């Protein structure tokens, strides 16, 4: 994405509608969003990656959802190049290879387990 093509308002509107659709179908559902990872666009660093992540995180409080900040968890800007060098990201530096997706799943599992273990049911 080139900077002029990312429209945060449109992005947020789409996510708000998705959240509303989920809540209409399952009113008591807990919703966990996962932010984007760093990436390339047309073989160059995607200048919108941070803006996409920031927009998604802005939904947490007003929409009462949780969000795992995958972008920062993996290292933020430039992390896709590190992941590629380690064999986790594909040559396009947009998609992960199988091991990259496995790594993301393991990281998410670890985050969820830590959150569950630190949860105090006596507090809302």
Report residues per predicted region.
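Oxyanion-hole/transition-state-stabilizing segment in secreted/luminal serine hydrolases
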Residues: 1-10
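Active-site neighborhood of glycoside hydrolase catalytic domains
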Residues: 18-25, 111-114
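A short helix->loop->beta-strand "cap" motif at the edges of active sites that frequently abuts
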Residues: 26-30
